[in-house]
Amino acid sequence: MVHQVLYRALVSTKWLAESIRTGKLGPGLRVLDASWYSPGTREARKEYLERHVPGASFFDIEECRDTASPYEMMLPSEAGFAEYVGRLGISNHTHVVVYDGEHLGSFYAPRVWWMFRVFGHRTVSVLNGGFRNWLKEGHPVTSEPSRPEPAVFKATLDRSLLKTYEQVLENLESKRFQLVDSRSQGRFLGTEPEPDAVGLDSGHIRGAVNMPFMDFLTEDGFEKGPEELRALFQTKKVDLSQPLIATCRKGVTACHVALAAYLCGKPDVAVYDGSWSEWFRRAPPESRVSQGKSEKA
């Protein structure tokens, strides 16, 4: 593994609160609320309008994606991403801090962290502990929407951090990359259904290793430390000195794998953007593994 100085992937609630208190928010520092919830559970934009971190803009993951794709949450184009984040006052010189309101402490924030990185922006961090701990620690909130001055952002896709269906299919034979799936064990094995999914059976890509993303978080919603994270990878026999692809259902919690590896000093984990949603619909049946299906047979 090549050792390099990595931009801090996490910032603390204390650091952000102090940055806000001392007037550092502006073109050089922007905060994004990247919350998203399953339909019928919570309304992310409504909750943002009710209360959010002062100065935060709402990052709508439903809007900032490839809406023409048949698969969930696929990346937008370079131009689409650049236009969207530019409207949020983000330039190539902005430090971006992302959080979400998930009770686990973090869910969609690592996806947005990865999106910035895959489009060439390295000065991006996740708020460690999320909005859950921001509230718990008594930091200020507001209902006032943020209206930043638009900025110019130039997006350059870093293809080394992104894997396609064809590349993962080829990897079944070449085995050049390790493959880690971040969904729950039941969904990975095929013994539990995919939530809110019509026509999508659970299971996994042949050869994948299961590391549920919740294992990277403490009970209090903070990211575990590098030593604990390395131990998790070692337990699963995932070699952080070798190439690694992360996958899940739709390329969201896979970004937790990328973040955890980054915190261990490995910044080059690629995400299979289509993940299981695409794989289930396109891949040969023999490349899909499901205990649930085999038990029914």
Curated annotation (Swiss-Prot):
<feature type="modified residue" description="N6-acetyllysine">
    <location>
        <position position="236"/>
    </location>
</feature>
<feature type="modified residue" description="N6-succinyllysine; alternate">
    <location>
        <position position="224"/>
    </location>
</feature>
<dbReference type="GO" id="GO:0008097">
    <property type="term" value="F:5S rRNA binding"/>
</dbReference>
<feature type="domain" description="Rhodanese 2">
    <location>
        <begin position="173"/>
        <end position="288"/>
    </location>
</feature>
<keyword id="KW-0325">Glycoprotein</keyword>
<dbReference type="Pfam" id="PF00581">
    <property type="entry name" value="Rhodanese"/>
</dbReference>
<dbReference type="GO" id="GO:0005615">
    <property type="term" value="C:extracellular space"/>
</dbReference>
<comment type="function">
    <text>Formation of iron-sulfur complexes, cyanide detoxification or modification of sulfur-containing enzymes. Other thiol compounds, besides cyanide, can act as sulfur ion acceptors. Also has weak mercaptopyruvate sulfurtransferase (MST) activity. Together with MRPL18, acts as a mitochondrial import factor for the cytosolic 5S rRNA. Only the nascent unfolded cytoplasmic form is able to bind to the 5S rRNA.</text>
</comment>
<keyword id="KW-0597">Phosphoprotein</keyword>
<dbReference type="GO" id="GO:0051029">
    <property type="term" value="P:rRNA transport"/>
</dbReference>
<feature type="glycosylation site" description="O-linked (GlcNAc) serine">
    <location>
        <position position="35"/>
    </location>
</feature>
<keyword id="KW-0694">RNA-binding</keyword>
<feature type="domain" description="Rhodanese 1">
    <location>
        <begin position="25"/>
        <end position="143"/>
    </location>
</feature>
<keyword id="KW-0007">Acetylation</keyword>
<feature type="modified residue" description="N6-acetyllysine; alternate">
    <location>
        <position position="175"/>
    </location>
</feature>
<feature type="modified residue" description="N6-succinyllysine; alternate">
    <location>
        <position position="175"/>
    </location>
</feature>
<dbReference type="InterPro" id="IPR036873">
    <property type="entry name" value="Rhodanese-like_dom_sf"/>
</dbReference>
<dbReference type="GO" id="GO:0016784">
    <property type="term" value="F:3-mercaptopyruvate sulfurtransferase activity"/>
</dbReference>
<feature type="modified residue" description="N6-acetyllysine; alternate">
    <location>
        <position position="224"/>
    </location>
</feature>
<keyword id="KW-0496">Mitochondrion</keyword>
<dbReference type="InterPro" id="IPR045078">
    <property type="entry name" value="TST/MPST-like"/>
</dbReference>
<dbReference type="GO" id="GO:0005739">
    <property type="term" value="C:mitochondrion"/>
</dbReference>
<dbReference type="GO" id="GO:0005759">
    <property type="term" value="C:mitochondrial matrix"/>
</dbReference>
<dbReference type="GO" id="GO:0009440">
    <property type="term" value="P:cyanate catabolic process"/>
</dbReference>
<comment type="subunit">
    <text>Monomer.</text>
</comment>
<keyword id="KW-0677">Repeat</keyword>
<dbReference type="GO" id="GO:0004792">
    <property type="term" value="F:thiosulfate-cyanide sulfurtransferase activity"/>
</dbReference>
<feature type="region of interest" description="Hinge">
    <location>
        <begin position="144"/>
        <end position="159"/>
    </location>
</feature>
<protein>
    <recommendedName>
        <fullName>Thiosulfate sulfurtransferase</fullName>
        <ecNumber>2.8.1.1</ecNumber>
    </recommendedName>
</protein>
<feature type="binding site">
    <location>
        <position position="187"/>
    </location>
    <ligand>
        <name>substrate</name>
    </ligand>
</feature>
<feature type="binding site">
    <location>
        <position position="250"/>
    </location>
    <ligand>
        <name>substrate</name>
    </ligand>
</feature>
<feature type="active site" description="Cysteine persulfide intermediate">
    <location>
        <position position="248"/>
    </location>
</feature>
<feature type="modified residue" description="N6-succinyllysine; alternate">
    <location>
        <position position="14"/>
    </location>
</feature>
<dbReference type="GO" id="GO:0030855">
    <property type="term" value="P:epithelial cell differentiation"/>
</dbReference>
<feature type="modified residue" description="N6-succinyllysine; alternate">
    <location>
        <position position="237"/>
    </location>
</feature>
<feature type="modified residue" description="N6-acetyllysine">
    <location>
        <position position="163"/>
    </location>
</feature>
<dbReference type="GO" id="GO:0035928">
    <property type="term" value="P:rRNA import into mitochondrion"/>
</dbReference>
<dbReference type="GO" id="GO:0000098">
    <property type="term" value="P:sulfur amino acid catabolic process"/>
</dbReference>
<feature type="modified residue" description="N6-acetyllysine; alternate">
    <location>
        <position position="14"/>
    </location>
</feature>
<feature type="modified residue" description="N6-acetyllysine; alternate">
    <location>
        <position position="237"/>
    </location>
</feature>
<feature type="modified residue" description="N6-succinyllysine; alternate">
    <location>
        <position position="136"/>
    </location>
</feature>
<keyword id="KW-0808">Transferase</keyword>
